UniProtKB/Swiss-Prot annotation:
Protein name: 1,4-dihydroxy-2-naphthoyl-CoA hydrolase
Record-annotated membrane-spanning stretches: none
Active site: 15
Source taxonomy: Bacteria, Bacillati, Cyanobacteriota, Cyanophyceae, Nostocales
Gene3D superfamilies, per the entry: Hotdog Thioesterase
Enzyme class, broadest EC rank: hydrolase
Gene Ontology molecular function terms on file: 1,4-dihydroxy-2-naphthoyl-CoA thioesterase activity; fatty acyl-CoA hydrolase activity
Amino acid sequence: MPFTYHRTIHFQDTDAAGVVYFANILSICHEGYEASLRTSGISLKEFFTNPNMAFPIVHASVDFLRPLFCGDQVIISLVPQKIGAEKFEINYEIYLADVLVAKAVTRHVCIDANTRSKQELSTEIIQWLDGYRKETEEVERRKAREVV
């Protein structure tokens, strides 16, 4: 089951044309990521200031399907998934009412903050990822039963 984050588009999110500036949609997605961590019980202060471990974003992409304007009320739906022993990916869908207006992906790699070398994901992040994996699997099982 995706995590949902509600957000109002602010004037500061927009560019001279009055639409959301392309890079700001990633910041808005990151807000959703942070909210999902916080909701699962992860201390953001400890997570982002851990002197031994960091989770840099090594890939990001966005597809814009419709423009967003100041005052728009959006819902960010995100699903994180483990894609290796040391990395995970988050898929985001941004909705205005029931209309999909943008899609984004961020890929994160777990590194030792001192040596900058890859390391396995922390137990805390694995538990966060597993929570979404289990919820998603349960939703898929329910859908499969409905089809039968």
